[in-house]
Amino acid sequence: MNRNFFLVGLLFAILPISTFAQKQRSQAFKEKYILKEAVILSRHNIRAPLSTKGSLLEKVTTHPWFEWTAGASELTTRGGALENQFGLYFRKWLVDAGLFKENANPTTNEVNVYANSMQRCIATANYFKTALFPVGDVKVNHRFVPSKM
C-alpha cells in the first residue's frame, strides 16, 4: 500500500514536467535553431499478400479471400494514396522548418530518394516524392532491376 502511494505521488510530481515538454515553442525559441538535414526512413505502404489466387494457402483456408486491386506483393492503390498523404505531411513540415521553400525543385545533391528494388518499395517512394516535391524532378534511386517477392 505504501509503495503504491509512493508511485502515485511520483506520477503526480512528474506529470507537470511532461506537459512542459509538449508545450508549443515561441517563434523566438524556434529562431535559435536551424534544421540543416533530415533523414526519413520508411517501410512500403499497404501491399497485397504474397500469396496469389489459387495458392495452397487459399485452398486450405475456409473463408473466401478479399479481391485485391494489385498483384501479389505489389503496392495497392490505397497504399499509394496513403503514401501521398505522408509526402504532403513531410512537405509541410520541411517548409515550416525552413529546410525547403514552398514548391522547391531540389537538385540531386540536395535530395536522395532511395528504395529497395521491390515494386512495392519503388512505388511507395514514387508516391512519397511526388507529394513531397510536386514541381520537382526528383528521381527514385534503387540498385537492381525491379523484382517481385
Model-derived features: positions:
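Long, internal stretches of domain cores in catalytic or enzyme-like folds
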Residues: K23-M149
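Bacterial Sec-dependent N-terminal signal peptides
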Residues: M1-Q24
